[in-house]
Amino acid sequence: MLPVIAIVGRPNVGKSTLFNYLTKSRAALVADVPGVTRDRQYGETTIDSQRLLLVDTGGLVDTENKEVAPLAETQVEQAIDESDCILFLVDAKAGLVPADEIIAERLHKKGKKIFLAVNKADRARAAVVQSDFYKLGFGEPYVIAAASGRGVKDLMTQVLENLPEEKEVIEKEVGIKIAMIGRPNVGKSTLINRLLGEERVIVYDQPGTTRDSIYIPFARNDENYTLIDTAGIRRRAKIQDYVEKFSMIKSLQAMHAADVVIFLLDARQGVTEQDLRLLNRIVEAGVSLIIAVNKWDGLNIEERDNVRNAIDRRMPFVDFARRYFISALHGTGVGKLFRAIQESYQSIQQELTTGQLTRALEKAVAEHEPPLVKGRRIRLRYAHLGARHPLTIVVHGKKTKSLPQSYSRYLANYFRKTFNFIGVPVHIKLKTDPNPYEGQEER
């Protein structure tokens, strides 16, 4: 599971600035989907080969007319509880204020590893600033400038060194890892029961990392699977009895840990903004996607047509994903999900050599050439596999920075069709080859 770092502090201390600085590297790989409201409170970053999930709690608190919003019973409380460690940000220019002390008192009760970072500090006053905030009780503060990044690397190096070790909970032969993602009350727990089946074989059910995620291995038709329970579904006395609680953090962790995501829609409620935001996150994670539209049996013909039209209209950015119209309660259509899981997983495991990808690139260019830039055609030379999770194909060429996003989407679709990637979002990463003559004086 991705380690979670929560950025906490009172308003206007620079939480979003630090969040944006740490996550800016993702912008080159993942573009916003048109028409989808981007959720800016959660972001992924990679530091020294360690992938992290960052949570900017500043976007989660209603601070209107309040100096310090209450932490209790808010998403901030949930984010803090589900994090592995906390970056507590304060403002050097404002100095230590009562709001900082109130937050510090609450954080001390959490039992988490907390790093105190003093933002907006001049180098000349670093020692003075550190002594002012030392009384908060989190050890020596780290002096940073989030806007420029000064001091941030040293801070994050210490964060990485203090992350709790993840426990090994999955044995070797557990098969395909499946995550169930969806809004609250769309039928996730019912579908999980249906997937596990009446004659299920539960190998084990034990806590995973410090965030208490749970892996549930099971077998069906001699095939092994593992259900990743990180969306807040917890067993009670009986396995049939589940309690559901939505968590964006655990949903994001599930996406990144899974081989295949089943995204569940409620046919009676249609496509909501929250559905679109979750789908956007799944595309970013690059995991294989299957869309299951639940409670289908309760709709008449006209209502079904309306739902299909709404999906076509509002979800064109996931048109690569297979759709299944099901009833988790009665089991209608659920059997097809297992075939889709197998096919989707196998398609992403196929061999992808540089030669194969380059030949596909050449055919794509021959069928639809890149546009002209200042009268010259953008040249794409070769392609190779950058990563499988997310599936990233790196395309090398000249002047690739000028390639429009529409052409990158064309290439992604072409690769998907050529290699029959089933339900897999394809990310295109463009690289411009160095110009050997750049920087030389004209003669």
UniProtKB/Swiss-Prot annotation:
**Domain annotation EngA-type G: ranges:** 3-167, 176-349
InterPro entries to which the protein is assigned, alphabetical: G_ENGA, GTP-bd, GTPase_Der, KH_dom-like, KH_dom-like_a/b, P-loop_NTPase, Small_GTP-bd
Q: Which CDD domains match?
A: EngA1 (cd01894), EngA2 (cd01895)
Keywords associated with the record: GTP-binding, Nucleotide-binding, Repeat, Ribosome biogenesis
Q: Name the Gene Ontology molecular function terms of this record.
A: GTP binding; ribosome binding
| Domain named KH-like: residues | 350-434
Per UniProt, where does GTP 2 bind? 182-189, 229-233, 294-297
Q: What is the stated purpose of this protein?
A: GTPase that plays an essential role in the late steps of ribosome biogenesis.
Q: How does it assemble?
A: Associates with the 50S ribosomal subunit.
**The family this protein is said to belong to:** Belongs to the TRAFAC class TrmE-Era-EngA-EngB-Septin-like GTPase superfamily. EngA (Der) GTPase family.
From the Swiss-Prot or TrEMBL record, give the protein name.
GTPase Der
